[in-house]
A protein has these predicted regions:
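Short beta-strand and beta-hairpin "edge-sheet" elements
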Residues: 64-96, 172-173, 295-324
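Acidic, small/polar-enriched beta strand-loop surface segments
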Residues: 1-10, 161, 175, 183-320, ...
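Extracellular/virion structural assembly segments
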Residues: 22-58, 102-103, 107, 114-118, ...
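Surface-exposed cap/loop segments at beta↔alpha junctions
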Residues: 49-134, 331
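Polar/acidic, low-complexity leader/linker segments enriched in S/T/G and N/D
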Residues: 1-27
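Oligomerization/assembly interface segments of phage tail-like spikes and tubes
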Residues: 31-50, 89-102, 219, 251, ...
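Short beta-strand-centered interaction patches in the first periplasmic/extracellular domains
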Residues: 2, 86-103, 139-213
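Amphipathic, non-transmembrane alpha-helical segments in extracytoplasmic/periplasmic proteins
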Residues: 41, 45, 96, 109-136, ...
Length: 332
């Protein structure tokens, strides 16, 4: 299928056996939406009967010129529904939790910590494996450069997310519920082009954010650190012009050929001082794009071109499976 052009859509809701992670029975739904973030997913669906608490998987069934397929959109755990009565008809609004819900409900023992030098991805995966969903991680994970100490009331899930953030990686939850821990993708997952099967609706919001740009940066690589400052009175974002220091720290460092840590710090500060540019738009659903992915946008008529990192997504369970998302500019 060509997901950049129009297709018809219907939806299928199945129960899932947590022991095998396979589909079993059928359930009826009438609509709803899915919310996705980096490392998270939830759904709000309307059903014709009370499902109780059980694992479910929602599919998009797409058709296009005789071709088609079934794509998993969301897998999660149903919660207590809200019953709505209209005359003699009943419907149930059901909130569905992420596949990480079991790990969110387990508290770590007091004093737990992830030690400096440990494999961060391995530790995070072990914390999440209390969930029935399959959890995997990439094999080239960096080690923790400093210990991550659990806070009071820390859960398996929140600790796993803190460890993953500490190594500069991310958690991706696929539509089938599988969990993958890896570095943020460096290659584009899709291209949305006004000249080639335009999938984006005309309404876009383009936002520039300079307020959070740092003027001081500390970079950490192993036992070494370097700092860079912008004290230039001619720079609009400098400590002089803004009258205050705005710090940022980076622990995931990739040096260029013959580049020193100090030179890297200076270069990264300049890059981070470029005001963030965020677009928000609606488009047809594409199964290859999730929060944290890169997409290439080519809309030169409105000044939107380059690679953008997808943030939050909202997927409508309805006509065209419309997806609304925000994405922040990274590079050309």
């Amino acid at each position: 299928m060509d997901w950049r052009t129009s297709y018809s859509s219907s939806f299928l809701l199945k129960t899932v056996n947590p022991a095998t992670w396979r589909d079993e029975g059928d359930l009826q739904l009438t609509g709803g939406s899915i919310s996705r973030t980096v490392g998270g997913a939830s759904a709000d669906i309307t059903m014709t009967e009370d499902p109780g608490e059980q694992w479910v998987r929602l599919y998009l069934v797409a058709r296009q010129s005789g071709d088609g397929g079934r794509v998993p959109l969301f897998t999660g755990l149903t919660s207590a529904p809200t019953e709505n009565i209209n005359g003699t008809a009943k419907s149930y609004r059901v909130e569905c939790h992420s596949v990480l819900k079991p790990a969110e409900d387990i508290l770590l023992p007091r004093g737990y910590y992830a030690a400096e030098g440990a494999n961060g991805a391995l530790l995070a995966a072990e914390l999440l494996r209390i969930c029935p969903a399959p959890v995997t991680y990439a094999g080239n994970a960096p080690d923790l450069t400093e210990a991550v100490i659990a806070e009071d009331g820390e859960s398996n899930a929140s600790m796993a997310k803190r460890i993953v953030e500490a190594i500069g990686w991310q958690i991706r939850i696929a539509g089938d519920g599988s969990v993958r821990i890896s570095a943020p993708p460096a290659a584009e997952s899709a291209k949305f082009d006004v000249f080639e099967g335009d999938a984006i609706e005309p309404a876009l919001t383009h936002t520039y954010d300079w307020y959070s740009c740092p003027n001081c940066l500390r970079v950490v690589s192993g036992e070494s650190t370097a700092e860079a400052r912008d004290d230039d009175p001619n720079s609009a974002l400098s400590t002089v012009m803004r009258g205050r220091e705005i710090w940022k720290q980076e622990k995931s460092v990739t040096l260029g050929d013959r580049e020193t840590l100090a030179a890297y710090a200076q270069r990264r500060l300049k890059e981070l001082q470029a005001p963030s540019r965020t677009v928000n738009y609606r488009r047809r659903y594409d199964p290859d794009v999730f929060p944290g992915d890169l997409v290439r946008l080519h809309y030169p008529g409105v000044g939107i071109q380059g690679l953008y990192r997808v943030g939050n997504q909202s997927v409508t369970i309805g006509k065209a499976c419309t997806t609304q998302e925000d994405a922040t500019y990274e590079r050309n």
